[in-house]
Curated annotation (Swiss-Prot):
It catalyses: nitrate + a quinol = a quinone + nitrite + H2O. It comes from Synechocystis sp. (strain ATCC 27184 / PCC 6803 / Kazusa). Its cofactor is [4Fe-4S] cluster; Mo-bis(molybdopterin guanine dinucleotide). [4Fe-4S] cluster binds at C14, C17, C21, C56. GO terms for cellular component: formate dehydrogenase complex. Residues 7-70 form the 4Fe-4S Mo/W bis-MGD-type domain. InterPro entries: Asp_de-COase-like_dom_sf, CT_Nitrate-R-NapA-like, MoPterin_dinucl-bd_dom, Mopterin_OxRdtase, Mopterin_OxRdtase_4Fe-4S_dom, MopterinOxRdtase_cofactor_BS, Prok_molybdopt-oxidoreductase. Keywords: 4Fe-4S, Iron, Iron-sulfur, Metal-binding, Molybdenum, Nitrate assimilation, Oxidoreductase. Belongs to the prokaryotic molybdopterin-containing oxidoreductase family. NasA/NapA/NarB subfamily. SMART domains: Molybdop_Fe4S4. This is Nitrate reductase. Binds 1 [4Fe-4S] cluster. It is an enzyme of class 1 (oxidoreductase). PANTHER family: NADPH-FE(3+) OXIDOREDUCTASE SUBUNIT ALPHA, RESPIRATORY NITRATE REDUCTASE.
């Protein structure tokens, strides 16, 4: 295990969102640096290029959650109705290995699954890929990034030939027009928003467009807020393209030299004249034309998007149709411009680079590509053909595998699917049928632990050393500066020990996380996400580094890689970017007389995911003491409801009960509910008991952002 450094101040990375803010953990002079969490104070790292010393309430209070309700020892029970028993690590590892061997004999390796998390460090991801996809020969490794970022991955891949956001945070401060769609950046990525908002306030010519059915803190400061109807994103984007083409506000030279399928794209957008678009989207002609003018007349345009676009059964198409506007106007590969997807979790980017979805391999490689498989097999020193050529199960498919008895072993790591998965009642029933479920986490109790047979205590941020990559492709070293409590271990060490016990000693002979990292970056060499020039030593000396960062680069070059595609050469076979030709299909579950409201959901400023950390922080609990349903006054009046009334919300799958907040911040016909409450925090406020699992056929990301509900007073 990596020992915590004995330093008065440790530069590290915030473990919450994908902004990747730099933090400084300052040890109390009265106490050892390896004492409990309250011996350290957190402040923003002014030298970190992504955050420049800024920190939000989550990062500022993170130490308050480090020692509350931690899982300290391995715990086991043979069935869900049995009490937990503390066991040794030796016994726990024996159980894991025995169960893997049993399932291999009964169901084959396709019956083995791991469902992990963007909370893991890149080293954790990498060792898990090697264990499952390499040594065990199953691609059934997926993560909660499937629920947040997989549509962005497939959008970039299909449009540009590779995943990877082409922009950087500096672009926030030099763009002439920022187009935000499907992102409440002020609440969900606050430090990014602070940088953009400062630029916007100081430069009157800069335009800020926000597309969101809610009037969020982000929308409140916009020059133009387009409160479109849920599900009409593609219609809006095609409508803007229609006007840009009509007004000749396009870059024909860029289109001719660097894109393909433009003529077919023109045929698509011809179906989206303004009168049709305004009716479907629920906006005025003036608003639509203003948006197109802002985009078309700006010297540089930067678009930002997140879960509001990705969490859709057309999530890939939505991302690609936004990219279309950049291709149409040549707004990519230059300062202040480009399509910028904002990652949700601190290492969702690093996970993608390490192959952390069931169709990927490390280094932005594809499972389906035989050359990619061969390259990975050679480095891993496993037999040719060991890596299965077919993608593994996605997150939802894993739980359905439990339901139909095709999955006999589910290893859940650093995530809480009994709160975060759609159609929760079905997920819970599937877990009740599981023959063996592991929950490897830093905290207990969690909602998912209620459905597990084995609990493995994990070291978390501050207790293990590793790297994470933020939304602007910047890799930061996150060193251990405290000792893990109890018998908690780093995730990668647990995976490696299981691998050794399965007979793969040579593949898992890592002495520390730096050794894992050295092997991992070899698989990124000469790939778009090249990190062969990144090492722990360079990160300690130079600070965070953006990729591509090649081994051959001089030190001065390592600090200058800001944007991708500056030469307009894309990663497709012919080097041209692809226009998306998809039409809008609306919502997967439209409203009807029985379910007349669209329920959307999202984050609150203070909370994070399912509250395993933030639910223990008093300041944040006071900010957000309970979940509330937002409803427009017109809808409330029709139902005879006023603020603070209790209502029942029902979908075709489940129900919840919440207090109402009557507000004009939400559009008529749409209601909003926060996503953070599981049954341990409120016994009747699970938003995902209402949502459905219909997913984008390309990214397999569920449409978590919209479902049809009815509402009645209680």
């Amino acid at each position: 295990m990596d020992s915590p450094a004995i330093l008065p101040t440790t530069r590290t990375l915030c473990p919450y969102c994908g902004v990747g803010c730099g933090l400084e953990a300052v040890a109390s002079p009265q106490k050892s640096v390896v004492d409990a969490g309250h011996a350290h104070k957190i402040r923003g790292d002014r030298q970190h290029p992504s955050s420049q010393g800024m920190v939000c309430v989550k990062g500022a209070t993170v130490m308050e959650s480090m020692d509350k309700q931690r899982l300290l020892y391995p715990m086991f029970r043979s069935s869900l109705d049995q009490p937990w028993q503390q066991i040794s690590w030796e016994a726990a590892l024996e159980i894991v290995v025995d169960k893997i061997q049993q399932v291999k004999q009964t169901l084959g390796v396709s019956g083995l699954c791991m469902y992990a998390s963007g909370q893991m460090q890149t080293e954790d991801y990498y060792v898990a890929q090697k264990l499952f996809k390499g040594c065990l020969g199953t691609n059934n490794f997926d993560t909660n990034s499937r629920l947040c970022m997989s549509s962005a991955v497939s959008a970039y891949s299909l449009s540009f030939g590779s995943d990877g956001p082409p922009c950087c945070y500096e672009d926030l401060e030099i763009t002439d027009c920022a187009f935000l769609i499907g992102t409440n950046t002020a609440d969900c990525h606050p430090i990014i928003f602070n940088r953009l908002r400062k630029h916007h306030k100081q430069n009157p010519h800069v335009k800020l467009i926000v597309v969101d059915p809610r009037c969020t803190a982000t929308a409140e400061v916009a020059d133009l807020h387009l409160a479109i109807n849920p599900g009409s994103d593609i219609t809006l984007l095609h409508g803007i393209a229609y006007l840009l083409k009509k007004w000749n506000l396009i870059d024909q030279k860029f289109i001719d030299n660097h894109t393909q399928d433009f003529e077919q794209y023109c045929q698509v957008i011809d179906h989206y004249p303004p009168e049709k678009v305004t009716q479907i989207c629920g906006i005025s002609l003036e608003q639509l034309e203003t948006a197109a003018h802002y985009w078309g007349n700006a010297k540089t345009v930067l678009s930002l998007w997140s879960m509001g676009m990705n969490q859709s059964f057309q999530g890939t198409a939505k991302g690609r149709c936004l990219i279309n506007l950049h291709l149409l106007t040549g707004q990519i590969g230059k300062p202040g411009s480009g399509p910028f997807s904002l990652t949700g979790q601190p290492n969702a980017m690093g996970g993608r680079e390490a192959g952390g979805l069931s169709h990927l391999l490390p280094g932005y490689r594809s499972i389906k590509n035989p050359q990619h498989r061969q390259e990975v097999e050679q480095l891993w020193q496993i037999s040719p053909g060991r890596i299965n050529p077919e993608p593994g199960l996605s997150a939802w498919e894993m739980f359905m595998g439990l339901e139909n008895q095709q999955v006999g072993f589910l290893w859940i790591v650093a995530t809480n699917p009994v709160v975060s998965m759609p159609d929760l009642e079905r997920v819970k029933k599937a877990l009740q049928q599981s023959t063996f479920t592991i929950h490897q986490d830093a905290y207990s109790p969690t909602e998912t632990a209620e459905y597990a047979h084995l609990l493995l205590p994990a070291a978390q941020w501050s207790e293990k050393t590793g790297t994470m990559t933020n939304s602007e492709r910047r890799v930061t070293l996150s060193p251990a500066f405290r000792s893990p409590p109890g018998e908690a271990r780093p995730d990668w060490e647990i995976f490696a020990e299981v691998g050794r016990r399965l007979g793969f000693e040579n593949q898992f002979n890592f002495v520390d996380s730096a050794a894992v990292h050295r092997e991992y970056v070899q698989l990124t060499a000469e790939r778009l996400c090249d990190q062969s020039g990144v090492s722990y030593e360079k990160l300690q000396k130079l600070g965070p580094l953006q990729w591509p960062c090649r081994q051959s680069d001089q030190e001065s070059q390592l600090l200058s890689t800001k944007r991708l595609y500056t030469d307009y050469k894309f990663c497709t076979e012919n080097g041209r970017a692809n226009f998306c030709l998809d039409h809008s299909r609306g919502l997967a579950e439209p409203v009807d007389p029985n379910y007349p409201f669209v329920l959307t959901n999202g984050r609150l400023y203070g909370h994070w995911h399912t509250q395993t950390r933030t639910g223990h922080i008093e300041k944040i609990k006071k900010m957000h003491p309970k979940p509330i349903l937002e409803m427009h006054p017109k809808d409330a009046e029709k139902l005879g409801i006023k603020s603070q009334d209790l209502v029942a919300i029902k979908s075709r799958r489940g129900s919840a009960q919440l207090e109402v907040l009557v507000t004009r911040a939400i559009a008529p016909g749409t209601v909003f509910m926060p996503m953070h409450w599981g049954f341990l925090w409120d016994d009747n406020a699970e938003v995902n008991s209402l949502t459905h699992a219909t997913a984008c056929p390309i990214s397999k990301q569920p449409e978590l952002k919209a479902c049809a509900v009815n509402i009645t007073p209680v």
